[in-house]
Amino acid sequence: MDKHGVKTPLWKKETEELRAEDAEQEEGKEGSEDEDEDNQRPLEDSATEGEEPPRVAEEGEGRERRSVSYCPLRQESSTQQVALLRRADSGFWGWLGPLALLGGLTAPTDRKRSLPEEPCVLEIRRRPPRRGGCACCELLFCKKCRSLHSHPAYVAHCVLDHPDLGKAGAAGNS
């Protein structure tokens, strides 16, 4: 909080602290020679006593100290996660299990009603072919069988009995 009792966001705090430290460092550079000599003497004295000398923070470390760090989430193995999920499911959803089984009974009957099976082309009464064509000469694709269907006497009719063939043959010969 600042002097007025207002909370300041972390990103503003960091910039303000950096500016203050930069100003201190500039002032410190002027008298740094005297301070360095004073700082080295106590460090040597404390090292002889067996204590660790205090670390002087570098620029990179100072920034890291002021920055917000996020701890990574702990990692669990997949088998542990599955076991935890099963325990959680059994507690809350365990009593719903029988009801869910009953709810699934109506679904297959609805599916049968909504998707009627298409009959084979040979089972359907066909309309007469368009453009005055011959019904015996038709080839039809059947979606149910996934193949082509034709009249049983297709070949004999088209080659031997077709009325148009006789007229075309007579016109071709003359």
Swiss-Prot record:
Stretches the record annotates as Disordered: 1-69
Basic and acidic residues biased stretches: 1-31, 52-67
Coiled-coil residue windows: none
Highest taxon in the source lineage: Eukaryota
Pfam families: DUF4637
UniProt cross-references to PANTHER family, sorted A to Z: DUF4637 DOMAIN-CONTAINING PROTEIN, HYPOTHETICAL PROTEIN LOC689039
Protein name: Uncharacterized protein C17orf50
Source species: Homo sapiens (Human)
Chain's gene name: C17orf50
